[in-house]
């Protein structure tokens, strides 16, 4: 029953997202072209805009009121100042006007028993007007390549089962992980990142 309810929630949330045709039209109306977008690592100076992007993209994803932008900015500021251990990264999607329109945050986790490193795709978001244009696929691939560059060949994503982006995760080869009770809680696993690096 829980899986069914979550699937309905994903479907409803997904209905409110713009179609590919709509977003291509909006892209042209803004005078943008796909080749004009760049991808780069986030820096501490990006904190104000990154926090704003995070808050808005989260609200769009779950059809919720925009969370406190200042809270998100604080969280990112804390990440840059207190978690500067080299065990995480954030890749940004930037348009020609230098506006942030998407990001992916990855974390490197170390197994306490084997000392083996594992990838955690902690967050991946695009503003709704920039979805279904291939930018998310490129962003995902860059995150995969970053993990591979660290010698990591597997990755997990611990999301929310109501997230309509579950379809995207599965399109990118994510395998659903189920709880002992058989419920899907939004978690995915990729066991061979080398196969994904060429997407």
Model-identified regions with their sequence ranges:
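Conserved acetyl-CoA-binding loop of GNAT-fold acetyltransferases
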Residues: 170-179
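Acyl-donor-binding surface of acyltransferase catalytic domains
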Residues: 1-33
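Conserved hydrophobic beta-strand within the GNAT/NAT acetyltransferase core sheet
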Residues: 121-124, 155-159
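Conserved active-site tyrosine of GNAT-family acetyltransferases
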Residues: 54, 168-170
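Conserved beta-strand-loop-alpha-helix junction that forms the acyl-donor binding cleft
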Residues: 131, 156-166, 182-185
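Acetyl-CoA-dependent GNAT
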Residues: 25-28, 32, 41-47, 52-127, ...
């Amino acid at each position: 029953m829980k899986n069914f309810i979550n699937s309905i929630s994903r479907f409803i949330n997904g209905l409110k997202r713009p179609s590919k045709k709509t977003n291509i039209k909006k892209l042209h109306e803004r005078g943008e072209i796909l080749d004009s977008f760049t991808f780069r690592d986030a820096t501490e100076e990006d904190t104000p805009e990154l926090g704003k992007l995070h808050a808005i993209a989260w609200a769009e994803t779950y059809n919720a009121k925009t969370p406190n932008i200042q809270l998100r900015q604080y969280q990112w500021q804390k990440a840059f100042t207190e978690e500067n251990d080299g065990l995480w990264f954030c890749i940004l999607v930037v348009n020609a006007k230098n506006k942030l329109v998407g990001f992916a945050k990855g974390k490197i986790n170390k197994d306490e028993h084997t000392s083996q490193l594992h990838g955690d795709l902690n967050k991946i978001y695009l503003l709704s007007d920039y979805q279904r244009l291939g930018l998310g696929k490129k962003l995902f691939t860059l995150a995969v390549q970053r993990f591979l560059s660290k010698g990591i060949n597997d990755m997990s994503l611990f999301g929310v089962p109501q997230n309509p982006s579950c379809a995207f995760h599965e399109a990118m080869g994510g395998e659903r992980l189920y709880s002992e009770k058989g419920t899907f809680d939004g978690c995915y696993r990729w066991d061979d990142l080398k196969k994904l690096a060429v997407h």
